[in-house]
């Protein structure tokens, strides 16, 4: 049952093959037996109670396609009455008094929350090794990383521990783990999904999205997650289309742009071969391929690692050991309380980024670093605008390599370089997606799709058409 999609499980409920309670218990048993370390908190009692409500809804004829579907929620979304840690010691004891808007929306359609997934601390990381709760393992090979920061979410879907999961993407944190774990993940246009109650890392870059088995499932979940929210000042008041409507549209005549900068040195040969094979599949469906250029792509990493740390140093200043969160014991005075609570509560990578951000925002350096980074960010955005005048969608790799060994990358800069292909979509606020497109070294490879603003329907249509022609998304890890 753990390989079934949302559509297949909903049909199973309809045909009375199993009840919501039975399905939920099945998933809870799988989580209990798993050693992927994908979950921080398992909400078994809550899940079974929600499943019973869902069964009642189905029996009364008031169900929707998502009623009773078990999912995993990234532990960055506030959940009323349930621990919300963001993968940090700082929030290890924090129980949210309210629901994030995303949590609220998912509750309204009677989904079943199995638990909160493991993640890089405060979403800062590309390997899910930066969690206070330990590293997450890749279901395809337990010695490999699952990607980050939504590694627990990706591992839970790929490992058959949930039907789908929520994720967040600040610089690739949905797309990269989706790619490395062989699942489907979409980061919509900035402002499409409310950030209210989603613990902030970098406010101008953060965006939530679904992580699923298929593009069709992603469309179904995005229908619920998307929408304007007056509680979020960055939320855009734009009507949400039904993302399932155009899934079956023909993609004949689609113009695909391949940025030459995506295929330069540093890209693994086997990964490149898989990407080009996927592009040929689209050509066989009638798509047209053009080479394009994003000349400022090389600056995406330095720009991101100025802008994001600056925003995080401001956002995380609220965690001081006074109002909530970790508080150091036996402190001498208020200054000692701040100093020790933050130094003991935050992990190494979070402290590194706070320090970088505080330095870049300090007097005398603001113009040289932060202001300059924002100017180059606009240049990167302009590159995309010019490219989308000629094409419909950008395609390329998500990550330069497949999943690397746990503990093998010690140098932070080497870790940052792995984000080269994903960061630019966040800097420009564009929608991006990863879909399974093959294997290299027996590990999944994801194809990245980047669209123009508000083109989620088109991306999902393109992805769905690819999945009708290929079976990469149907592959499951032997360990699971």
Curated annotation (Swiss-Prot):
Protein's job: Allows the formation of correctly charged Gln-tRNA(Gln) through the transamidation of misacylated Glu-tRNA(Gln) in organisms which lack glutaminyl-tRNA synthetase. The reaction takes place in the presence of glutamine and ATP through an activated gamma-phospho-Glu-tRNA(Gln).
Natural source organism: Ruthia magnifica subsp. Calyptogena magnifica
Enzyme type, top EC level: ligase
GO CC annotation terms, alphabetical: glutamyl-tRNA(Gln) amidotransferase complex
EC number: 6.3.5.7
Tagged with keyword Protein biosynthesis: yes
Gene: gatA
Keyword Ligase annotated: yes
Subunit structure: Heterotrimer of A, B and C subunits.
Any Pfam family hit: Amidase
Family: Belongs to the amidase family. GatA subfamily.
Active site residues according to the UniProt entry: 74 (charge relay system), 149 (charge relay system), 173 (acyl-ester intermediate)
Top-rank taxon: Bacteria
Database matches in HAMAP family: GatA
Biological process terms in GO annotation: translation
Reactions listed under catalytic activity: L-glutamyl-tRNA(Gln) + L-glutamine + ATP + H2O = L-glutaminyl-tRNA(Gln) + L-glutamate + ADP + phosphate + H(+)
Gene Ontology terms, MF aspect: ATP binding; glutaminyl-tRNA synthase (glutamine-hydrolyzing) activity
InterPro entries registered for this protein in UniProt: Amidase (IPR000120), Amidase_CS (IPR020556), Amidase_dom (IPR023631), AS_sf (IPR036928), GatA (IPR004412)
Name of the protein in question: Glutamyl-tRNA(Gln) amidotransferase subunit A
Keyword vocabulary terms for this entry: ATP-binding, Ligase, Nucleotide-binding, Protein biosynthesis
